[in-house]
Design a protein with these regions (language model features):
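Hydrophobic beta-strand residues in large extracellular and virion-surface proteins
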Residues: 3, 21, 37-41, 74-78, ...
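Generic detection of long, well-ordered alpha-helical segments
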Residues: 10-18, 127-130, 134
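Active-site scaffold of zinc-dependent metalloenzymes
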Residues: 49-85, 98-102
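Zn2+-dependent metallopeptidase catalytic core
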Residues: 13-36
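Short alpha-helical catalytic segment bearing the HExxH-like zincin motif
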Residues: 86-94
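Metalloprotease/metallohydrolase-associated module, dominated by Zn2+-dependent proteases
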Residues: 81, 85, 105-153
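Hydrophobic or amphipathic, alpha-helical segments that drive membrane association/targeting
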Residues: 1-13, 37, 42-49
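Short acidic alpha-helical/loop segments enriched in Asp/Glu that coordinate divalent cations
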Residues: 33-39, 108-109
Length: 153
């Protein structure tokens, strides 16, 4: 797995961010799948004010047109005004979404029109709070974050 970090202050310890990515994704993905994953983590001030969220995970535009059926390139945006612990909790949440995309549980299509599916079921029109992929990410974020920091890293 390759992780690049952009616009994230050093106080968040870039090495620790990379370790967290590996820790979380190694719980869900095989070593073979993990070695192909590329994640760009982009810090953004005021993300909450601009977009109404503390973090986002998306399949990189590099994936589309690559001919690959399973996405392996991801972008995670995180609000850098967060405190240390919350940033890692949000990172864990977004990494659950990476797992969902990489395992093809969560899929988005843009042609002929936008559709979002979860395990084969169309969830395009569901409210954010009723989305099963968000329920899973919220259920796992704190547990993963606590497990990561219990390792004493």
């Amino acid at each position: 797995m390759h992780v690049t970090i952009k616009n994230v202050p050093w106080k968040f310890k870039h090495g620790l961010i990379r370790k967290c990515c590996h820790f979380v994704l190694s719980k869900f993905l095989s070593p073979q799948k993990l070695q192909h994953i590329e994640i760009q983590i982009v810090g953004s001030k005021e993300l909450m004010n601009k977009e109404g969220a503390l973090g986002f995970c998306s399949v990189s535009d590099d994936h589309f047109g690559s001919g690959k059926k399973v996405p392996v390139w991801f972008i995670i945006e995180i609000d850098t005004r967060l405190d240390f612990k919350t940033l890692f909790q949000i990172l864990c949440h977004e990494l659950v979404h990476v797992k969902q995309y990489a395992c093809r549980e969560l899929r988005e299509t843009y042609y002929p029109r936008y559709r979002k599916t979860w395990k084969g079921k169309d969830i395009t029109d569901r409210y954010y709070s009723h989305s099963p992929h968000e329920h899973e990410a919220f259920r796992k974020e704190l547990v993963l974050c606590e497990e990561f920091f219990k390792l004493g890293v």
